[in-house]
Amino acid sequence: MSIHGILGEQTTDYPTEYSPETLYPIARSMGREVIGWQDDKLEVGFDWWQAFELSWLNEQGISQVAIARFGIPASSPFIVESKSLKLYLNSINFTEFGSLETVQTLIAKDLSKCVQAEVNVELFDLEDEHSGLLIAQPDGICIDDALADSTEKVALTLHPDASLLERNTSDAKISEGKTFSFYSNLLRSNCPVTNQPDWGTLAVSITSNKPVNNANMLRYILSFRQHNGFHEQCVEQIFADLSQYYEPSELMVRAWYTRRGGIDINPCRVSDIALLPVPSRLIRQ
C-alpha cells in the first residue's frame, strides 16, 4: 500500500457527515524495516496525539468543542496518517451526540480499529485547568548552543548519520553508569507524504557508561533536517541509534512536534515501560 494512498494526490473532499472510512492506516513495519533493528525493542512506549479542533453537535444542534488526546501504543501494527485523522475529526463536526462520553467512546472505537490496537482517548473541557494540557518544559539541559564555540560549519545531510555520535571521542567509559538528561528544540525532518517540514523538540534521558558529548549529539540531531520520515519513525531511529552506540541500561526518547491542521504528534519510546513519562505539551504547541 502506498503511503500516499488517496491523500495528497488529488483535491481533498472534506466530509460533512460522520465518515470513519477516511481513517488511513500505515504499517509501522514500513519505517522499522528502514531502521533495521529489533522491532520488539521499538514497541515499548506510546504515540500521543493532541487535537485542538474537535467539535460536534449536541442534541439541540449547538456546536460543542473540546481538546483531545489519543494514546496509541507503540506495539500497534499500524499508525494513522495525520491528514486522514483531520478529515475524520472534521466529519464529526455536524453529527449529533448526547454526551461528551459518547464522542469519546466512538473515537476510541474507530481509532482502535484503524491501528488494530486499543487506543486511549481523553477529551478535555476548555475550562479544565487540570487537564494536563498546560504548557510544560522539557527535563534536562538544552544542548542547542553546544556548538557555539566551534568554528566548523555543520553540513546538511540527506539522511541521519549516527557516526556523528562518536566523532573525535575517546573510548573512555564511566566506571558507574551515569544518567544524562538533555533536549533540543532543533529537531527537523520532512513528512514523507507531503514533503513539508516537521519541527519538534527532542528530549532524551539515558543512563550509560559512555559519556554523552553534547556537541556530537547536536550534530546528530541536525542530521535529520532533510530526512523523510514520519514522526514515529524518526523517534524510533534515534532510539535505535542511541541504544546501539551507548548500550544504555535505561533510555527514554521522546519528541513533541509542532501542530499541523490542529493536531500535534508526540512519540515516546522507552527501554522499560516503567520509564514512560506522562504526556505533556510544550510552548510551540
Swiss-Prot record:
Statement: the UniProt record of this protein carries the keyword NADP: yes
Binding site for substrate: V80, E81, S82, H231, E232
Residues annotated as binding NADPH: S82, K83, R260, G261
Reactions performed catalytically: 7-aminomethyl-7-carbaguanine + 2 NADP(+) = 7-cyano-7-deazaguanine + 2 NADPH + 3 H(+)
Residue ranges crossing the lipid bilayer per the database entry: none
Enzyme Commission number(s): 1.7.1.13
Protein name, as recorded: NADPH-dependent 7-cyano-7-deazaguanine reductase
Biochemical pathway: tRNA modification; tRNA-queuosine biosynthesis
Organism: Psychrobacter cryohalolentis (strain ATCC BAA-1226 / DSM 17306 / VKM B-2378 / K5)
